[in-house]
Regions:
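Conserved GNAT-fold acetyl-CoA-binding loop/helix
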Residues: 34-54
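A short helix-loop-beta-strand connector motif used in the catalytic cores of GNAT acetyltransferases and
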Residues: 54-65
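Acyl-donor (CoA/ACP) binding surface of acyl/acetyltransferases
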Residues: 1-36, 63-172
């Protein structure tokens, strides 16, 4: 999964590689609300920065475009980053216009599930600032739990994904 996903589709989005033509749209959705929370993004984030990010995508750091259901409008970015051994980190940001509409939850869940299916036994983690309540809530909705450990980035806490069991036991 350190290679770009060829294609993933959900009910409301398509997840594809980022293309060179995406530079302007990527710069547009990467506003101050994003750059203030993502430590490696410069502010302001320009088209040149977008091109540099896309040029560096590959190998251990892969950035995926989250597009609308038609596959046209860029609504967000999901990064998959290989860490040590069989550990992968996910990160994401979404355009202000789609926040609060469930698009991020749907897209991040799809990527995490595809990653887990393609890498049996891998560990999937995310780092989240404790004050970023919306991001923490998204991660919890899709199965991430707090590890109680600090992340590698300043002020971040490490969360780990736990697959939902394939069965359920009801006790009456």
């Amino acid at each position: 999964m350190t290679d770009t996903l060829l294609a993933l589709s959900t009910d409301h989005c398509r997840i594809t590689p980022l293309f060179a033509d995406d530079a302007r749209a990527l710069a547009a959705i990467t506003d101050e609300t994003v750059t203030s929370r993502v430590h490696f993004l410069p502010a302001p984030f320009t088209e040149a920065d977008a091109r540099a990010l896309m040029a560096g995508s590959g190998g251990g750091d892969v950035f995926h475009a989250v597009r609308d259901a038609r596959g046209l409008d860029l609504n967000g970015v999901i990064g998959v980053h290989r860490r040590v051994g069989q550990e992968y980190e996910i990160g994401y940001w979404f355009a202000a216009r789609v926040r609060g509409k469930g698009i991020a939850t749907e897209a991040v869940r799809a990527v995490v599930e595809a990653l887990a299916a393609s890498r049996p036994g891998c560990s999937i983690v995310a780092e989240c600032h404790p004050d970023n309540e919306r991001s923490r809530a998204l991660l919890r909705r899709i199965g991430f739990v707090s590890t109680g450990r600090a992340g590698k980035r300043p002020g971040r806490m490490l969360m780990a994904w736990r697959a939902a069991p394939a069965y359920r036991i009801d006790v009456c």
